[in-house]
Structure formats: C-alpha cells, structure tokens
Amino acid sequence: MITIKFLIALLLLPCLVLAEEDQPLPGHSHVGDAFDEGPRQSASLLGGTGKVTIPITSSWPKAQAYFDQGLGQLHGFWYFEAERSFREIAAHDPNCAMAYWGMAMANWENAKRAKDFTAKATALKDKATNRERLYIDAHSNYFDNDPKDAKKRHQEHINDYENIIHEFPEDLEARAILVCRIWQFSRKGLPIHSYEAVNAILDQIHAKDPMHPAHHFRIHLWDKRKGSRALKSAAQNGPSAPSIAHMWHMPGHIYSKLHRYQDSAWHQQASARIDHRWMLASRVLPDQIHNYAHNNEWLVRNWIHIGRTQDALAMAKTLIANPRHPKLNKITKRSSSAGYGCARLIDVLTKFELWDQALALVETTYLQEEDLSLAHQRDRLQLIGTAHFEKGNNGGLSEAIVSFDALIIKAQELHQESAIKAVEKATTEKKSKKDREKAVKAAGMKTSSLIKSLEQAKSGLEAYLAILNNDLPKAREKFGDIKRDKYALALIRLRLGDNEEALKLSEEATTKKATGQVLPLAARIEVLHGSGKTEEARAAFEELRKISSSTDLSTPPFTRLIPIAAALDLPADWKLPATVHDDIGHRPELDTLGPIAWTPPNAPDFTLPDGDSEPIKLDSFLKRPTILILYLGHACLHCADQLQAFAEHHKQLEAAGFNVLCVSTDTVAELQKSQQAYAKDGENMPFTLLADPECKIFRQYNSYDDFEDQPLHGTFLIDTNGKVLWQDISADPFDDPVFLKKEALRLLPLHITS
C-alpha cells in the first residue's frame, strides 16, 4: 500500500534540487536567523508617528524619513512596525549601521534578536558618524553581558546615554530614550532616586518641542506615583503621534488613576479603533500588536466602572472571537486576547448579574470548558454556581459544587507531575539534596496556590447552597470563601438580615479607591435604603447620578433602584449629564478612527492554472470554508512535512466541511510531473494544486518577503464570504492541521456575516 508520506515524496521528487549545506531553508532569511521573525513586508511612510529625528548616514535618499518614522514608532512602543521601518532602510542600504540599531531597539525585550541586530550595527559602525557610534556602542555595551550584574549593567547603559547628551546637548532623542530606560530599569531593581530630576529632563525636551512624543514617558513616570503631574501630557500624548494606537491608550493610565473612567475609556476605545484600522490595512493579527489585548481588556473594566453593560459585554466577546494562534494568542496565556477575553466576559456577566446569559454562554464557544486552563475552568464553574444561586436553583448549584471535585483532582495530578519533573531536572543537573528539595517546593508553589483557590471556590458555592437551604450558621461559617466584590457580598449580607455587616461591607466597597464606579455605589444605596437610612441613601444616590451619564439602567443592579428612586422622589431617568473636563485636549470623532472590533480582511480573489493548465478560481472553492496553503514548490523539503500533515488529515478536514487548496511557486509543467507521479500508482492527488511561479498570489496575501524578494510559507482560513479568519505567515510552514481544524470550527460561528 502506498502511504501518504510516499505520495508527498513523489510530489516533491520531480526536479528536486538539493540545497547546499550552507543555504537557508526556503522561506528563511538569507541575511541571518534574526530576520526570520518580525515583519517581512515593505514599509510605507504613514505620517502621524511623531516629529522626531536622529541624523543618520545612508546612501538611500529616503532613509532619514523612514528612520525618523521608526524612531517615533519606538517612542510609541509600536515595535513590530518600528522594525518594519528600519528593515526598509536596510533593504535599500544594507550598510546603514543605524538601521540595525533601530531593529535592535525594536526588540528590546527580545535579547537574542536584539544581540544579533546589535552585532550587525557594530560591524558597520566605522561607516557611521561619531554620534551614531555612541548610540550603537550603548547597545553593544548593554548586550555584551558585562558586567554580569544586571543593576550595574543598567546603570552603565544610563551612563552611556548621558554621555551622548554630554557630547550632543541638542539631542532630544537621547534624552527621551534615557528617560524611557530609567523608567524601565526602575521596574527591574534600579530605583528612581529623584522623580523630579527625571521630570526635569522631560521639561527640557518639551521646552524645545511641546509636542514631542516623550509625553508617553512622563505618563509612565508619574502613573504609579502622582498621576495629576501628567495630566498635561495625557492631553497631548495622542495628538503627538496620532497614528500610533498605544499613544492614545497611555492617557487612560492617568485618567484611570484619577478615577476619570469616562476619559480613560474614550482613550482606550480610540486605541482599539486605530489598532483595528491598522489590522485591516496591514493584515496583521490582533495579538501581533504590543499591548493590544491589555488595552481592550482595560477598556472592558472601565466600561464596567461606568455601567456600559452592553459595550463591555461586546468587547469581552470580541476578544474571545479574535483568532487564536499557538505562538501569539493562546487561551492558557492570561495576557492574550483569549485569556483576557475569558476573564473579562466572566467579570461582566457576574458584576451586572446577567445570569441567564451566563448560563447560556458557558455552553457556547465563548466559554468552552475543554479549551480553558484550570484557572479559567475554576472561574467558569464559579460563574455557573453563582448564577444558579442567584436564580434560586439548588440543583444546578449542587451540580457545580460536585464538578469542582474533578478540577481539584486534575490540579493535584498537575502538582504531582510538576514535582516529578522538578526532581528529574535537579537530578540531571546533579544538584544537592537540599537544592532538589528547594526545586520541588518552587515547582509546586503555583499548583499549590491553584489547589487552594479551587477548594476555596468550592467552599464559597457551599455557602451559597447553605443560604438557599436556610442553613444560616453554615452560610455564615463559609461566607468568607465566597469570591465576589465587597459590594456584592454586602447585598448577600443584607439578604441574610445581617444589616450591620452589610453596611460595613458596602461602606468599605465605596472608599476612595472606588470613586467614580457606579456598581459599588448602587449597592450602597440598596443597603442604606434597606437598613432604613433614607437620608444617607439619598446622598449616595445624588453621588451616583453625577457619574451615571452612560450607565445602562436596564440591568439588574439598576432596575432594583427604580422603587428606591421613586421613594426618594427622583425622576425615572435619574442620570445627570457627564462632566466635561477642560483639560482633555483635542479629540477626533471616534467613528473616524476605525472599527471597534477586529474585522476579518477580504481574501484577494485569484485565478491560477492547475497541473492541466485549467484555470481555477478561488471563488469556486468558497462554497465551503477553505484552507489555503501557499507552499514553496518541489525543492522545499519542509513543505513536504506540511503537505504530509494536511494530507493525513484530509478526510477529517473534508468531513468537517473544509476544502483544502494549495498554491505552489512551481510552474504548470512541474505540477504536471507531480500529477503524473501520482497517476502511475493509481492514486488521486489529495489536494488541488495551482501554479503561481511569479508569486503574484503570495504577494497579495503578504506571504512574501519584500526585503529579500522571496516567497514565504502561508496558511489561511477563508470563510464562505471570502474573509480571512485566520493566518500563519512564517519562515516555516504551519504543520498542525488538528489545531487549525479546531480553531476553524471555533471561529466560523463567531464571524457569521450576512
């Protein structure tokens, strides 16, 4: 019997050209491994990235403009696009040392790539000016790991930038980078000894250029210390580099710190829209953008604070609906779109008491149990139990309690596995008995904490059950294990008749930290009114009115206030207009910035010949969702692994409703030889193969390295409306059809369009 592997081998045997040992694999960079990652499509001058410059040496006339753009993108932490700008320079002038310095800067948190780029810059620095050499040397000194002590190395790096300022007093960018590094190093053990001194450096920059994007760094400087010191920068940060989403995000730090959640949410929404607009234009995936998921999850939190229920719910679901990827966006990574989305969706459903929606959504792709980490499964099960409690459903609550036992067993097994692995690792490394014990203890800390949290969550649900069964002694005994916000606990205490405890909890929930948040105040009003404290309830209601301009009054926490408002002679629509601050600067209309959610881009249509020279149109495949594979022809051996993997799962993909279409860099003649190889053995080709020797389709799908003029591996999921729901473009082919099938089945119902 002929195996699929043999068939794929036959496919690739015709005209097979063995690469020389020192040649990179097809799809890999010819310049170096560091270039296999990052952007590989050409840059363009965008505008709106900040008015900044460091004079550089280059033979390419446009190099300075692209360098300045990349520098502005660095200041805005738009690292992926900054690297693209610097790569554009290197593509036109490979001898431009500062292009590689820029690439290293764009990979500041990726030491391996940063070192490789710094080495290239260092090798070319003799062609650079003295100022450029100082910038390059600062990086070279930092990444040589000498001294080994991180604190000393951080201080030396700061000294190197101060030296640039000494040599070139007019250089604003050295000052900006210096401030950025001082702030970054303060988070890694090198404290800031004088915030005023650092702020004075920023004052020097803004005295020369009031709209320099170093406003970003002033926000970071004062964010954790005294937010009001950065209010002016908060107003100017977005306009200083309006094309960079993160520059609109950053003011949200200050406004949130000052409890101005309306202003914070405006900025986070602006950031989300600009990111989504860029995704449509550049075809990058959401989680390829630095800070994207964090911005949007924080937006959900701020919308919760001001009571925008439906907006918060929609954004949480949007995060979950973003495409997942093994390297970029995994449900097990809590800081990804998937991880944040799951956590925030549970938050919204719980805080706004949307119990019917909660019980419906836990059975959908939004909160599928099999996809979740144990921590997320804990939160999901806790949501289910809480919903049943609030609906008075003893049976459903009891089932949730029993379900926790299975999670606890899984966590205990994980704990044992981590201990065994720690022992094996310590033994392999020939560590002492004492060090082995330390390793086991360290390995078990995370799982021990997880087990404890699972047991506590179960106990909290048991407290709920005791309440429903009117077993008040047991309810009060276990009450401390209920994991809810204090204001929600206050309402439960009120329900139990523990008015004094309810008053205490509701007061604690409305301390200064909760200023500007509608939910704690709404609960406080309920508790005060239910405890006969009418005038205090009236005063609290007046405070709520001032911050509720955008609150959705149709959700349970606010519908319960209807009779209280009537008793206090307040109007049915008791909200007051929002306070408009006079320190917010210029704000564009949000709708002009881009869509509020990630929008799948259009799949470029095409017509290409198959091995029989018959024209095949992509559109003819789109009666079903289609997996499109762009592979690098008969000479690509690791393409064989990919095609083999998908061929082995071809029947499963077909049964699940998917077409598979492959586009090759081969000519029609080469495809014909592949078909003939199959025909000799009486087999049918498992896929339709099309020829694109000029790589036109590769370019249209961004599956092409513009800088090195070569095709890249690309795998895409296209729905029946011609939208690209998922993609992988890389130096290496994507060879996990099991993941892609599962992700495709998850994505398709989440992105149904008319």
Residue positions per predicted region:
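N-terminal alpha-helical interaction modules that lie
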Residues: E20-R218, G227, P239-A241, H259-A270, ...
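Alpha-solenoid helical repeat scaffolds
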Residues: F67, M98-G102, R133, A176-I177, ...
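N-proximal helix/coil linker or "cap" segments that precede and/or mark the start of modular domains
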Residues: S550-T607, D619-L622
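Structural microenvironment flanking redox-active thiols in thiol-disulfide oxidoreductases
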Residues: A640-E683, C695-R699
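Alpha-helical adaptor scaffolds
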Residues: V179-W183, K188, Y195, P213-R225, ...
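TPR/TPR-like alpha-solenoid repeats
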Residues: A106, S140, R181, F185, ...
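Thiol-/selenol-based redox modules, centered on thioredoxin-like
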Residues: P711-S754
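Short active-site neighborhood of thiol/selenol oxidoreductases, capturing the structured segment around
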Residues: K617-F646
